[in-house]
């Protein structure tokens, strides 16, 4: 049983433009990735459903990144078929030695801590070629958010989260 009572949230399917009046500035934003959500607890890499990721290679690569929450991506993060490629590899039991990375964006051991402290904990525990800190952009105005969303879309990401 996982030691942390944690269930990842899903991104909203509607555009941020529909929620402008509800957003509280400043905020942190990042490019929305289209991979498989993953959280490491008790040495096991779990999917958003709180079921273990079935791939043995993924489990061996990321089991030591306790409390790291992120998105598994196979290949280029902006490839048109990134979700299909990621699912095909990550959900297969026996595929090995494929170009998978964990784009880490939170450290969920102490969820009541402010995000800046969780981010510091995350930065402290990351190392290796397969783990990448997923950058957050500090946004102070709605115009900055709109421009950041445009940039993310132009680069091939799904949008902003």
Where are these regions (language model features)?
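Short, motif-level signal for alpha-helix interfacial/capping segments enriched in acidic residues
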Residues: 11-17, 82-84, 139-146
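A generic structural motif
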Residues: 71, 134-137
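Amphipathic alpha-helical
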Residues: 1, 136-161
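Phosphate/adenylate-binding "loop-and-lid" substructures adjacent to NTP/NAD/dNTP-binding pockets
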Residues: 1-19
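Covalent nucleotidyltransferase
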Residues: 17-130
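Generic recognition of cysteine residues
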Residues: 12, 125, 152-155
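Short aromatic/hydrophobic-glycine micro-motifs
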Residues: 130-131, 157
């Amino acid at each position: 049983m996982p030691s942390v009572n944690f269930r990842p949230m899903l991104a909203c399917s509607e555009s941020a433009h529909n929620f402008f009046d509800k957003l509280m500035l400043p905020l942190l934003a990042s490019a929305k990735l289209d991979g498989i959500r993953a959280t490491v607890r008790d040495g096991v890499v779990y999917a958003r459903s709180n079921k273990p990721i079935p791939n043995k290679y993924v489990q061996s690569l990321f089991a030591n990144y306790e409390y790291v929450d992120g998105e598994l991506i196979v290949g280029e993060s902006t490839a048109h078929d990134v979700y299909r490629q990621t699912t095909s590899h990550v959900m297969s039991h026996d595929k090995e030695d494929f170009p998978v990375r964990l784009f880490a964006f939170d450290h969920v051991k102490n969820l009541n801590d402010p995000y800046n402290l969780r981010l510091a904990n995350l930065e402290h525990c990351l190392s290796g070629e397969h783990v990448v800190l997923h950058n957050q952009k500090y946004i102070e105005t709605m115009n900055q958010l709109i421009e950041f969303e445009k940039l993310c879309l132009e680069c091939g990401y799904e949008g902003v989260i």
